[in-house]
Amino acid sequence: MAANIAAAAAAAQEVDPVLKKAIKLLHSSNPTSAAELRLLLDEALKARFGPEKSLTNNMTPRMLEDEANFSGRAATPPQQPINADEIINLTNSPDKEPSDSVDTIADSDDGLSAVGIVNTGDTGDFGDLNCCVCGEMVFTATNRLIECSKCGAMYHQECHKPPITKEEAADDQEQNWQCDTCCNKPTSSGRTTSSAAAVTPTVFIADEPMPLTSKAKSSVASSRSSNSSNSSSPFYRPEPSSSTNASSSSSSKHGHKSSSSSSSKSHKEERSSKSTAASSLSAIGGMEKHNSSGTSSRRSGSSTKSSSKSSSSKHHESGSSSKRRSKQ
């Protein structure tokens, strides 16, 4: 401990005396302390940099004038006199009616003490900042004013139905909160889609063409409608149905007969063509057989001739041999 005290004393002795004097003048309340501090600084600058770097040469006349008029630093600040007219006795003062131009803002941790009174002068400028239920701007820590993120209306936590919870009034969830009116309001897009679905009829477009039966039915229906329209006209004369039926039956019979006769003729022609083809094939076969028999008879005739020739030659040879024998 004694060593620490000795070290502190040695450090105090090593401090520059000029710095000690400057610190004393800086905290002094003497009016001439500013001039003395400037002179001390001038001496230090001259000792280090020469007379050209004097602070007095660089000071403006206004700075010199302010230094001459310096009154010094007072040890204790003077107390301002209190006028007796500004003291108001709140205990005996009559109750004042609240004016519309005064808005009270109470914001504290316990929610009981008021921070201050703001005199707006005109409530129209701050009409959007009031609660849309009670119409007041006063709020506390437990009954804050929350703005709806959709419609922009302001609600007290207790004025809104249902009351706004602390989780909904938190700083991170306050920007996403919506009032009950906006939450229960149906969206316009849902209405438009439902109305469009109710008004727009459903139309089915077939990918494939309609069959012929439907076309025939439609043509029959159109013919019936045309007949009914013609019969309703005053100049329409109905035709006898029996004659039309008879003509249609006769035409159908005639068509059937003609078709049957044509089919029988075609069958006969086919049969005759088949018979002619068969006869031609048989004739061709007979000719081939006749040719083959002629060639065979020719071959047999030539063979008989050759055999007769050979026999005659043999007989001639035998005759000549017998003659030779008789001559001998």
UniProtKB/Swiss-Prot annotation:
SUPFAM superfamilies xrefs: FYVE/PHD zinc finger
Zinc finger intervals, PHD-type: 128-185
Keywords assigned by UniProt, alphabetized: Metal-binding, Nucleus, Zinc, Zinc-finger
Swiss-Prot/TrEMBL GO biological process terms: RNA polymerase II transcription initiation surveillance; snRNA 3'-end processing; snRNA processing
Gene3D superfamilies: Zinc/RING finger domain, C3HC4 (zinc finger) (3.30.40.10)
Lineage: superkingdom: Eukaryota
GO cellular component, one term: nucleus
Extent of Low complexity compositional bias: 215-233, 241-264, 274-283, 292-311
Principal cellular location given in the protein's record: nucleus
Subcellular location, record wording: Nucleus
Pfam families xrefs: PHD
SMART domains reported in the protein's UniProt record: PHD
Region (Sufficient for binding to IntS1 and IntS9 and for 3'-end snRNA processing) location: 1-45
UniProt remark on domains: The PHD-type zinc finger is not required for 3'-end snRNA processing.
Protein family (similarity comment): Belongs to the Integrator subunit 12 family.
Function, in words: Component of the integrator complex, a multiprotein complex that terminates RNA polymerase II (Pol II) transcription in the promoter-proximal region of genes. The integrator complex provides a quality checkpoint during transcription elongation by driving premature transcription termination of transcripts that are unfavorably configured for transcriptional elongation: the complex terminates transcription by (1) catalyzing dephosphorylation of the C-terminal domain (CTD) of Pol II subunit Polr2A/Rbp1 and Spt5, and (2) degrading the exiting nascent RNA transcript via endonuclease activity.
Subunit structure as annotated in this protein's UniProt entry: Belongs to the multiprotein complex Integrator, at least composed of IntS1, IntS2, IntS3, IntS4, omd/IntS5, IntS6, defl/IntS7, IntS8, IntS9, IntS10, IntS11, IntS12, asun/IntS13, IntS14 and IntS15. The core complex associates with protein phosphatase 2A subunits mts/PP2A and Pp2A-29B, to form the Integrator-PP2A (INTAC) complex. Within the complex, interacts with IntS1 and IntS9. Interaction with IntS1 is likely to be important for promoting 3'-end processing of snRNAs.
UniProt-recorded name of the protein: Integrator complex subunit 12
